[in-house]
Amino acid sequence: ERRPEDARAKLVAESNVLREVKRWPEAHAVLVGANQRFPSDTDLLYEQAMMAEKLARTDEMERVLRQVIELKPDHHHAYNALGYSLAERNVRLPEARELIRKALEMAPGDPFITDSMGWVEFRLGNHSAALAHLQRAYASRPDTEIAAHLGEVLWAMGQREEARRIWREGRSRDADNEVLRETLTRLQVR
């Protein structure tokens, strides 16, 4: 490809195809190569970070997301992804909340960022704040992963039947959702 935009488009298409068929190591390798060629392309860097996360390369994911934020300080997806990852791993929760707060400032009302805020509040032990965020996120977008989080908060608060109802809704939309499956297994819910 003589034109850089053509080369970039080809690399993006290749990584997308590999990701669709769940060949994550190969998709990751394509993105690493793409980022060597286009080192300041924040969209490619963000995609590399997401593939690194799929491969449990959390150090790489965190480093690359911080690079994205440095290059593009208004990249709310990078703030959210980094904050959510910290919350999911239950580490550096005050930092996670601050990253997610910044993402919400940039994209107020985004249901996925609102979900992340609910999740970090839950990890911090703030169940009522978590519930408020997660109910708002779920009302805005009844996504299966949001259902998993909302159900877990309801479960922890003793609202077991409501949790089961939310999980059933989530399962009816996406029975194979990894986050929901893991949540139900961990909490030993049938």
Task: Report residues per predicted region.
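Structural marker of alpha-solenoid helical repeat scaffolds
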Residues: 2-5, 37-38, 71, 106, ...
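Residue-level recognition of tetratricopeptide repeat
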Residues: 6-7, 16, 41, 50, 75, 84-85, 110, 119, ...
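TPR alpha-solenoid repeat register
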Residues: 9-10, 44, 78, 113, ...
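Register position in tetratricopeptide repeats
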Residues: 20, 54-55, 88-89, 123, ...
